[in-house]
C-alpha cells in the first residue's frame, strides 16, 4: 500500500503459474476434506501455490484417501508435461503420495497413456517442504486428464503417530 509514493504496508511475494488448466472444470472423484478445502473447487487450477503452512488456504487435503481428480480442458489440446505441488509436513501427519498416476482421454470415458510418477519420501520428521513432481516430457493430445496421487494410508513405524491415518496435501496441478 502506497500513500503519496510512500510504502505504508508490508510487501509480499506470490508465484502465479500459467497453465492450460487454469480455471478449468475439476471433477473430484474423491472429495477433499472440508477441514482443508483451500479456496474450493478451483484450488488445484487457480495458478497459486501454497506455503509450507498447511492451513494457509492454498492447500487441499485428503485424509487416508487418494487425491483423485479429472480436469476438463474444455477442448482437445496438446500436452507436453503435467506437474503437481505437494506438501510434506510429518509433524502434521502430512506425507507425500507414494506415486502419482496420470491418464488421458479425448472423450472423458476411455483413459489411456498412463504415466506413473514415483515420489521419494523426504527426511524423516524433517521440516515442512513444498515438493513439485512432474511427468517428464509427454507428447500427446487430450481433453481430460485424470490425476491420482496415492496416499500412503498410515503413518510409518518411525512416526509418533505410527499406524494413524495420513494426509496428502496438494496446491496446484500445472498442465503444459
Model regions and ranges:
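N-terminal non-cleavable signal-anchor helices
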Residues: 2-4, 46, 101, 118, ...
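Aromatic, loop-rich ligand-recognition surfaces of beta-strand-rich domains
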Residues: 51-115, 127-176
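Short, compositionally stereotyped local motifs that mark structural "simplifiers"
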Residues: 1-68, 87
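Short, solvent-exposed polar/charged micro-motifs at secondary-structure junctions
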Residues: 38, 125-126
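Short intrinsically disordered coil segments
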Residues: 31-33, 118, 162-164
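Surface-exposed loop and turn segments in beta-propeller and other repeat-based domains
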Residues: 118-124
Amino acid at each position: 500500500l502506497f500513500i503519496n509514493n510512500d510504502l505504508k504496508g508490508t510487501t509480499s511475494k506470490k508465484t502465479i503459474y500459467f497453465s492450460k488448466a487454469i480455471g478449468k472444470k475439476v471433477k473430484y472423484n474423491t472429495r477433499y476434506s472440508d477441514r482443508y478445502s483451500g479456496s474450493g473447487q478451483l484450488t488445484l487450477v487457480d495458478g497459486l501455490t501454497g506455503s509450507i503452512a498447511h492451513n494457509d488456504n492454498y492447500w487441499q487435503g485428503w485424509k487416508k484417501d487418494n487425491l483423485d481428480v479429472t480436469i476438463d480442458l474444455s477442448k482437445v489440446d496438446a500436452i507436453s508435461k503435467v506437474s503437481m505441488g505437494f506438501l510434506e509436513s510429518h509433524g502434521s501427519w502430512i506425507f507425500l503420495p507414494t506415486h502419482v498416476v496420470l491418464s488421458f482421454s479425448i472423450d472423458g470415458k476411455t483413459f489411456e497413456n498412463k504415466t506413473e510418477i514415483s515420489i521419494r519420501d523426504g527426511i524423516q520428521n524433517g521440516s515442512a517442504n513444498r515438493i513439485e513432481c512432474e511427468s517428464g516430457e509427454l507428447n500427446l493430445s487430450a481433453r481430460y486428464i485424470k490425476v491420482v496421487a496415492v496416499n500412503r494410508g498410515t503413518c510409518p513405524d518411525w512416526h509418533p503417530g505410527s499406524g494413524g491415518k495420513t494426509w496428502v496435501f496438494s496446491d496446484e496441478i500445472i498442465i503444459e
